[in-house]
Amino acid sequence: MTPHPRFKALCERQFSPGEEYVLAVPEFATTASRNHYFAVLHDAWMNLPEEDAKRFPTSEYFRKWLLVKVGFAKENSIVCDSARDAKNLAVTARSLDPYAVIVVSGKIVKIYTAKSQTAASMGKEEFQASKSAVLDLAAEMIGTTRDALAKKAGRAA
């Protein structure tokens, strides 16, 4: 197989001539699965205890926080010259990404950004794994199970 000219340099870095590679067609989660996920997650957000509800003004904030908490996130750690610089960096980071989870510890700033769940960013298996983990934690936060939450959201739809 010959790579498209646009991807030739990338292929030369990632593959060796003469080696055999397995090609696989990526599978994507169905639209129904994605729609169900967002409906169930919205229902969980609507049922958060008051102290948690204040932290998440929208279900999108809630979803991205959950993704970070269950490990579907990118982490950037930055060591600053001082604790004050770290606090200033955290403020700047917050203005650039209001959904990021930012942790300041002394001179170190850790910025966690939720992984995108678009079909182009996550294949079927990874989406299903993230969906299950996110809904498990969301259900735990409202004192129920993922299955019970999904059934309740299904009846409301």
Predicted features, each with a name:
Residues 1-157:
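Acidic (Asp/Glu-rich) sequence patches and key acidic residues
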